[in-house]
Design a protein with these regions (language model features):
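An N-terminal assembly and electron-transfer interface module characteristic of large anaerobic redox
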Residues: 1-258
Length: 258
């Protein structure tokens, strides 16, 4: 508490009207932050409320830095957001870097990823409705998880694009170990601006460690593992989906491409 930091940075978002008056010529951009809410260890909490029990709503970007969103996830580790990811979201950081320069960063819109189709339809309807009410010019959408939430991602994208709002999505891929399979479980021509966090089915070999905390007998049954994936020397062959944050869909990794 009494230590002086090496550097400080101040972040600020203005009210809707104030922002429009201050930057009338800058495109209005928001971040649609999808939250895992399938249940059974696929959970997220916003100010203590289970995300699956709430409707799509607006949140100030700086609130996420202060711990408003808490993770309750532990399944398929590669593309689940930990609380640390929420607090240090690179999408929020990068949007703030451009705020007042090339864009007017209006707000975050948080929406859930419930299992049932009726819930998906309701949440995506609300997402598109809020984007329209805010008179946005552009939106960045980040997914959390894969498979079932691919439908939420595409429904959000289709409906936001249908409002005439340019949309970019951030996701990851399950394209098979050879990278030749369809990357998402759902697709639509309107989702034509995509940033990928990588292929979760990519296989790596983890060398043996001198000290292991935990239980090795489960490495062949966790998501990303396979039968007999530990050899006689202790090497573990596993898909990167077993590693927390390996294909994080906020871009919190070191993956790059040229």
């Amino acid at each position: 508490r009494n230590v002086t930091p090496d550097s400080t940075k101040e972040y600020e978002t203005l009210g809707i009207k104030e922002g429009m008056q201050k930057w009338p010529d800058l495109p209005r951009v928001a971040y649609v932050h999808m939250l895992q809410s399938q249940g059974l260890l696929h959970d997220t909490y916003v100010y203590g409320v289970d995300a699956k029990k709430s409707l799509t709503t607006i949140i100030n970007p700086t609130e996420t830095m202060d711990g408003a969103i808490i993770s309750g996830n532990c399944v398929s580790a590669c593309d689940k957001n930990t609380t640390y990811h929420h607090q240090n979201n690179p999408v929020v950081a990068d949007l703030f870097e451009q705020h007042g320069k090339t864009i007017n960063y209006v707000c975050n819109i948080i929406t859930n990823e419930n299992v049932y189709l009726a819930d998906k339809m309701r949440s995506s309807d609300w997402t598109a409705k809020l984007c329209r009410l805010l008179d946005l010019d552009g939106v960045i959408v980040s997914q959390e998880g894969f498979g079932n939430p691919d439908t939420d991602l595409i429904m959000n994208t289709k409906k936001i694009e249908a409002e005439g709002i340019k949309t970019v999505i951030i996701t990851d891929e399950y394209a098979g170990r050879d990278g030749k399979s369809q990357s998402l479980a759902d697709a639509d021509p309107s989702a034509d601006a995509v940033v990928t966090g990588g292929n979760a089915n990519q296989v790596i070999v983890l060398p043996p460690m001198e000290t292991v905390y935990g239980h090795l007998e489960f490495v062949d049954t966790i998501a990303g593992g396979s039968a007999n994936n530990i050899d006689a020397h202790g090497n573990i062959t596993v898909e990167i989906q077993a590693i927390t944050g390996a294909t994080n869909e906020t871009g919190f990794n070191y993956l790059s491409a040229r």
